[in-house]
């Protein structure tokens, strides 16, 4: 195995120059990259010091060995931390449940995907009819008549129903790896510590109430594992579940339906938010995002050339836009009034 200084511009883990580039932000002077084999057993430990640091970013390049099926995390002061840029995470397949045997690690690589000729649909807002859904709640009911209830695959089973409704766009409530049960203490308790996000050995019995809706911090670059039939059917065994989300997007697009994701950010930096949205647009072909973030991040999203065709929806946009109207305000007042009318509420 060959170890050298990496490219600090590539956050997270990525294939790079016949090897793998690992980059991690931390204010610590020293850290360690821990690599685990396909069975999640310790494989390599790589010390990170000031020679591999630029500003607050550690970066290391690893080559000479195939690591595609391996996992990783970082160790700082004896604690193990997940990468905030993790693309897929182990042992998160059971919604609202944890086990003392769970080990939370990030997958080094995810499978290549054949998108065929798929691309975002880019409907004008004036032509859109939105349908907002919670992935789990949409098909979890016994009456849903789908095979994989409460999962991304369940949405595919309901495409004929969605088309019958006449909708053009589905909006997914948080479907990234949000922390619904407090399995990542560092993340849940401090949002984002100066050392990183999340520790992998949370062994105390969890007494937190389940956050069903997902408006909480999380690992924003990874799909929600427990929303995947692949991960939920095989707890304790990692299988690349990212393909399931991609299947959903491709099949919805094939049937003329856009996909917009809700993303609830807390105190994440503008750069992090921009990279996150770019990731979902390029890696998962989503058509847009409904974001909760501060004004500086929103402005950066609105001006990003890569996102010029991507729907960016918020609750307080009053700025300028380009030749294509891709920015929009979310009108909750109309939604709430319409819901009360349909339900027959008195107020």
Regions flagged by a language model, labelled:
Residues 129-131, 170-172, 259-261, 289, ...:
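Hydrophobic faces of well-ordered beta-strands that scaffold small-molecule active sites
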Residues 24, 74, 133, 162, ...:
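Conserved, mostly hydrophobic/aromatic
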């Amino acid at each position: 195995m060959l170890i050298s200084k990496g490219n600090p511009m590539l956050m997270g883990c990525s294939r790079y120059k016949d090897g793998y580039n690992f980059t991690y932000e931390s204010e610590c002077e020293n850290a360690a990259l821990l690599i685990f084999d396909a069975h999640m057993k310790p494989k390599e430990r790589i010390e990170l010091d000031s020679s591999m640091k630029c500003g607050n970013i550690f970066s290391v390049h690893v080559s000479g060995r195939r690591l595609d099926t391996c996992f990783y995390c970082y160790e700082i002061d004896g604690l193990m931390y997940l990468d905030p840029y993790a693309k897929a995470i182990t042992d998160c397949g059971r919604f609202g449940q944890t086990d003392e045997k769970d080990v939370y690690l990030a997958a080094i690589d995810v499978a290549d995907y054949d998108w065929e000729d798929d691309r975002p649909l880019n409907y004008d807002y004036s032509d859109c009819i939105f349908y907002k859904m919670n992935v789990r709640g949409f098909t979890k009911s016994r009456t849903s008549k789908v095979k994989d209830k409460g999962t991304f695959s369940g949405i595919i089973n309901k495409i004929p129903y969605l088309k019958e409704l006449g909708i053009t766009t589905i909006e997914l409530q948080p479907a990234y790896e949000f922390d619904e049960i407090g399995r990542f203490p560092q993340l849940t308790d401090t949002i984002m510590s100066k050392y990183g996000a999340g520790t992998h050995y949370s062994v105390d019995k969890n007494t937190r109430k389940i956050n069903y809706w997902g408006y909480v911090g999380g690992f924003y670059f990874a799909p929600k594992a427990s929303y995947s039939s692949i991960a939920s059917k095989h707890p304790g065994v990692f299988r690349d579940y990212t393909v399931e989300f991609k299947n959903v997007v491709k099949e919805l697009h094939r049937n003329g339906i856009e996909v917009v994701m809700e993303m609830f950010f807390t105190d994440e930096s503008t750069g992090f938010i921009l990279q996150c949205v770019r990731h979902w647009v390029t890696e998962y072909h989503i058509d847009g995002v409904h974001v909760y973030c501060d004004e500086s991040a929103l402005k950066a999203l609105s001006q990003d050339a890569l996102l010029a065709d991507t729907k960016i929806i918020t609750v307080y946009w009053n700025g300028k836009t380009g030749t294509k109207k891709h920015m929009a305000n979310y009108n909750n007042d109309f939604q709430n009034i319409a819901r009360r009318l349909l339900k027959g509420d008195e107020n």
